[in-house]
Amino acid sequence: MGAMQPMHWLIVAVVVVILFGSKKLPDAARGLGRSLRIFKSEVKEMQNDDAAPASAPVAQPAPAQLPTANTAVVANGAAAPVAQPTEVKPL
C-alpha cells in the first residue's frame, strides 16, 4: 500500500509535464545532470585532499603581524600611524 505502483508513477509524470511543460523539462534535466557531475567532482577532490595531507604534511607559513589599533595600512602595504581622537567640548 505504501509503495509506488506504476499507475502512481504515470500520474506523477503527467502532472509534472502539465506543470512544467515539455519545453522546460529537457533544460531542467540537463541542469540537474550538470549539478550532479559538479557534485561528484567536488566529492572526488575532497577525498583526494584528505589523502594528500596524510602522506605528505605541508608546512604552514607563519601568520603575518596584523596592524595595531594605532596604525593603519596604506596603499603600499606599510603601516602608518593614525592620529588619536581628541575630546570636543560642547558650547
From Swiss-Prot:
GO terms for molecular function: protein transmembrane transporter activity. The keyword Cell membrane applies. Keywords: Cell membrane, Membrane, Protein transport, Translocation, Transmembrane, Transmembrane helix, Transport. InterPro entries: TatA/B/E, TatA/E. GO terms for cellular component: TAT protein transport complex. The chain crosses the membrane at residues 1-21. It is a single-pass membrane protein. The keyword Transmembrane applies. GO terms for biological process: protein transport by the Tat complex. It is found in: Cell membrane. The Tat system comprises two distinct complexes: a TatABC complex, containing multiple copies of TatA, TatB and TatC subunits, and a separate TatA complex, containing only TatA subunits. Substrates initially bind to the TatABC complex, which probably triggers association of the separate TatA complex to form the active translocon. Part of the twin-arginine translocation (Tat) system that transports large folded proteins containing a characteristic twin-arginine motif in their signal peptide across membranes. TatA could form the protein-conducting channel of the Tat system. Belongs to the TatA/E family. This is Sec-independent protein translocase protein TatA. It comes from Rhodococcus erythropolis (strain PR4 / NBRC 100887). The lineage of its organism: Bacteria, Bacillati, Actinomycetota, Actinomycetes, Mycobacteriales.
